[in-house]
């Protein structure tokens, strides 16, 4: 047993924890779930954004870890998730001439509930300094029960840039890419402020709705 494993065992006695990915005892992430968070960057297309680079597929252990991080205050998952997002950022920057990162902001309700913005927190952990220029212009309904067209209509006009982005070549950053409605709205707000949208990097994409167009990590 390694020293790190021994220390984790001792910590589990005084502060019981379970794996954010599967619920196994005594580890924040068990040895079976850690490999699931190894980024395998894929690219996708969004009509309003262009290329979207995604680190992970939003399914299985990945989905459970992201939900635990966002909804159950499992901030111990922040480092591995930030590491995965950083690889998507690297791929995006290698393909696009980017001058600024702009994070898609949490909803006001989400920010009040958590006390922090999960995407900003991931970027900070990854050593990035995003521009905090997008804000809610109005409240949007929850997207979960809406069809694709309804999601786009629900998000339209919900974001605004708080200052000029003239001359900025922007890479948008978000957590999960599903229909593209949120990213498209963020792109609209950036363009309205004078910025150019060069694409987006996301932590995960929803594979049931999108088929990858190419793999960027050497796998076929």
Segments from the language model and where they lie:
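Glycine-rich phosphate/pyrophosphate-handling loop used in enzymes and phosphotransfer proteins
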Residues: 1-220
């Amino acid at each position: 047993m390694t020293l790190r494993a021994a220390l984790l065992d001792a910590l589990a006695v005084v502060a019981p924890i379970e794996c954010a990915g599967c619920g196994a005892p005594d580890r924040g992430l068990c040895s079976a779930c850690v490999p699931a968070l190894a980024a395998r960057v894929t690219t996708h297309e969004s009509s309003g954004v262009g290329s979207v680079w995604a680190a992970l597929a939003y399914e299985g252990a990945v989905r459970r870890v992201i939900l635990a991080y966002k909804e159950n205050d499992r901030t111990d998952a922040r480092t591995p998730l930030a590491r995965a997002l950083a690889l998507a950022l690297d791929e995006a920057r290698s393909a696009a001439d980017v001058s600024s990162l702009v994070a898609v902001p949490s909803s006001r309700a989400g920010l009040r509930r958590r006390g922090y913005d999960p995407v900003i927190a991931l970027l900070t952990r990854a050593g990035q300094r995003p521009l905090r220029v997008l804000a809610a212009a109005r409240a949007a309904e929850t997207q979960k029960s809406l069809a694709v067209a309804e999601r786009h209509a629900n998000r339209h006009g919900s974001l605004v840039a708080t200052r000029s982005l003239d001359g900025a070549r922007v890479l948008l950053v978000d957590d999960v890419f599903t229909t593209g409605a949120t990213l498209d709205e963020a792109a609209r707000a950036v363009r309205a402020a004078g910025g150019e949208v060069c694409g987006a990097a996301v932590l995960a994409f929803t594979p049931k709705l999108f088929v990858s167009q190419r793999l960027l990590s050497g796998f076929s």
